[in-house]
């Protein structure tokens, strides 16, 4: 059934009175108030003043590594503020949900006096290139009470403000990194300004506002290459990830030249983060042990947060201060005569590290890229061979902060460099690992999955990978809900609508010191109002395509503003309070039981191969030809484009 197109053009920026599915409008600055306009971060704090790290005087108390036995003191102190800040938006969210038989006001009053009772909420945004960024942006926008109409009928506005953590990897990491690199501006603001998220020009072409034509694209790449060269001239190793991260920054960070001096650790110095007015950002990457080319579930998972970088896995089981990643750590300390370094955690470099993927695609045949002169093809081929020999297809952190750290278990303990790759290469394409750690005590994770598992739609592979990882020693005893096979996801429709996993805590058998894992609210990318299964490697999108996919993500998050399920906001609220009610030994409200019967996977399995997966629109096709519909097998190799630009620009240095 197709709804009238007039029902699809209502925007979250404009008032409406009905719970209809929305379509994000074209760019219109006039609908955004002055107070909402994009605030450029004022903390480009790299000591070099640019992309290059720099040696600095160590503080009186030199930075050290710590074992991962608990949260850092900095995170604990921040949480003491943030958890209290989530009380009012959560109170409003639960009140609007109007759960029959549940006194939300009394519940929240009790939680205000006992924070351990307060639900601890996290949001995880999967990888998947621009598809993941745009689909994830739709979810984040729908959950943000700063945006009009998110708190009306069918809305879930305030869920973002009720959340403690916001994690991303690869394309989802671009979203998280972009939000925090722009003062945690709303999606509404980012769409309405012209400084970021202009995907019409691919990374290879460069930013439109620079006035660059096909002829002078090399000037853009020359600026990228010059900044990376400064890092190398300062004595630090560089890789293709440096170029990739620099190019990404032009699209994601609203500052001149993509903010080369902006660092990830400087998020901790921003006013809204210090006041804990935002969730806690986490980006994820995988470790690559010396000599490895295939990333398995046993790979060490690393996280970047504004305070620390490291791993909870028993292999490394330690964290280094993010601000001092480039320091000469050995066995957890900076030895006498060792140097402190700041600026290695450049924001684009961290986002690029979480999204390398180059070890899979750089050796592709670039001769198919239209318009590349033969001389450049020859030069690129030469560079690719050198990259393969030097293993520069990964993100390198040199010196390795975990040198001589946990020598018995750490695969990189005796290497001078720490090699990191795309956070989804171990198939855990949703950044769940940091959020399932018992010390973080997360109750519910809203897992937004934009993976390209089957015809560029997800089929639960990312969840299943995290579940299967719990059977190995690498999980360190961390539990995760049971996840069925891929065909069960498809045949039961678990990948075509929100699905809950781990609803009944009685299904978990706990050994000593184990804790019940979070409830997982799985929100898969599906065709609500757009064919949002665009290729991971599509390098550019029209404004209409971008907005349609973001609008589709909104409709996924809200079930079409309640069009598909008017009780969806109630079910979201039930997921939020579920673990808290279990801890308190209280009965599940009847309305929540109804929700759980509707959305919880009940253990049924149907593994029959039913052929090619081609889902139909769940609401209506909002401009089929304009939505970015993908032809299966289409692949635009943006990675080759990046390398071509890098080589060409380097020739001009």
UniProtKB/Swiss-Prot annotation:
Disulfide bridge map: none
Outcome following mutation: residue 45 to N: In strain: Lindegren 25a
The keyword Iron appears for this protein: no
Molecular functions (GO terms): lysophospholipase activity; phospholipase A2 activity
Glycan-bearing residues: 98, 114, 149, 183, 298, 328, 365, 407, 459, 476, 507, 533, 561, 602
Top enzyme class: hydrolase
Function per UniProt: Catalyzes the release of fatty acids from lysophospholipids.
Similarity-based family: Belongs to the lysophospholipase family.
Designated name of the protein: Lysophospholipase
Organism: Neurospora crassa (strain ATCC 24698 / 74-OR23-1A / CBS 708.71 / DSM 1257 / FGSC 987)
Lineage, highest ranks first: Eukaryota, Fungi, Dikarya, Ascomycota, Pezizomycotina
């Amino acid at each position: 059934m197709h709804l009238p197109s007039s029902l699809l053009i209502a925007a979250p920026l404009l008032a409406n009175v009905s719970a209809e599915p929305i379509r994000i409008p074209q760019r219109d600055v006039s609908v955004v108030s002055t107070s909402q306009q994009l605030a450029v971060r004022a903390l480009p704090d790299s000591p070099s003043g640019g992309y290059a790290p720099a040696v600095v005087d160590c503080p009186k108390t030199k930075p050290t590594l710590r074992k991962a036995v608990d949260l850092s003191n900095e995170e604990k102190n921040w949480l003491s503020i943030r958890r209290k800040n989530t009380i009012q938006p959560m109170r409003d969210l639960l009140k609007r949900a109007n759960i029959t038989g549940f006194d939300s006001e009394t519940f929240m009053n009790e939680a205000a006096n006992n924070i351990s009772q307060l639900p601890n909420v996290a949001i995880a945004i999967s990888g998947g290139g621009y598809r993941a960024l745009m689909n994830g942006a739709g979810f984040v926008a729908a959950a943000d009470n700063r945006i009009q109409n998110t708190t009306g009928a069918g809305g879930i506005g305030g869920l973002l403000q009720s959340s403690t953590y916001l994690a991303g990897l690869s394309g989802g990491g671009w979203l998280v990194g972009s939000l925090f690199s722009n003062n945690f501006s709303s999606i509404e603001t980012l769409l309405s300004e012209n400084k970021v998220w202009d995907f019409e020009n691919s990374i290879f072409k460069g930013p439109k506002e620079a006035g660059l034509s096909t002829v002078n694209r090399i000037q853009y790449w020359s600026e990228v290459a010059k900044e990376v060269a400064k890092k190398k001239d300062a004595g630090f190793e560089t890789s293709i990830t440096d170029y990739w991260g620099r190019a990404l920054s032009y699209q994601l960070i609203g500052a001149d030249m993509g903010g080369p001096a902006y660092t990830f650790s400087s998020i901790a110095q921003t006013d809204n983060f210090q006041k804990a007015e935002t969730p806690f950002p986490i980006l994820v990457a995988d470790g690559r042990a010396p000599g490895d080319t295939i990333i398995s579930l046993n790979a060490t998972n690393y996280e970047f947060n504004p305070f620390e970088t490291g791993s909870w896995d028993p292999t490394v089981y330690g964290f280094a201060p993010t601000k001092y990643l480039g320091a000469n750590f050995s066995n957890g300390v900076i030895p006498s005569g060792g140097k402190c370094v700041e600026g290695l955690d450049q924001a684009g470099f961290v986002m690029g590290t979480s999204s390398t993927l180059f070890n899979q695609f750089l050796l592709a045949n670039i001769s198919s890229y239209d318009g590349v002169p033969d001389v450049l093809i020859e030069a690129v081929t030469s560079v690719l061979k050198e990259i393969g020999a030097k293993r520069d297809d990964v993100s390198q952190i040199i010196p390795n902060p975990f040198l001589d750290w946990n020598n018995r278990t750490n695969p990189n303990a005796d290497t001078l460099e720490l090699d990191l790759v795309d956070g989804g290469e171990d198939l855990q394409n949703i950044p769940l690992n940091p959020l399932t750690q018992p010390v973080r005590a997360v109750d519910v994770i809203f897992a937004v999955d934009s993976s390209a598992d089957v015809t560029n739609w997800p089929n639960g592979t990312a969840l299943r990978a995290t579940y299967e990882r719990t059977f190995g020693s690498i999980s360190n005893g961390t539990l995760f809900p049971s996840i069925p096979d891929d065909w069960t996801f498809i045949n039961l429709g678990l990948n075509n609508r929100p699905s809950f996993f781990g609803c009944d805590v009685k299904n978990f058998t706990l050994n000593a010191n184990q804790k019940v894992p979070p409830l997982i609210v799985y929100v898969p990318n599906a065709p609500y109002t757009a064919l949002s299964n665009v290729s991971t490697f599509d390098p550019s999108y029209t404004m209409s395509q971008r907005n349609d996919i973001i609008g589709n993500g909104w409709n996924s998050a809200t079930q079409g503003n309640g069009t598909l399920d008017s009780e969806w906001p109630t079910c979201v609220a039930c997921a939020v309070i579920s673990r808290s009610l279990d801890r308190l030994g209280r009965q599940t409200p009847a309305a929540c039981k109804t929700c759980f019967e509707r959305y919880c996977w009940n253990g049924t399995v149907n593994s029959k191969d039913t052929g090619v997966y081609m889902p139909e629109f769940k609401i209506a096709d909002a401009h089929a030809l304009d939505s970015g519909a993908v032809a299966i097998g289409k692949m635009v190799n943006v990675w080759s484009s990046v390398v071509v630009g890098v080589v060409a620009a380097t020739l001009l240095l």
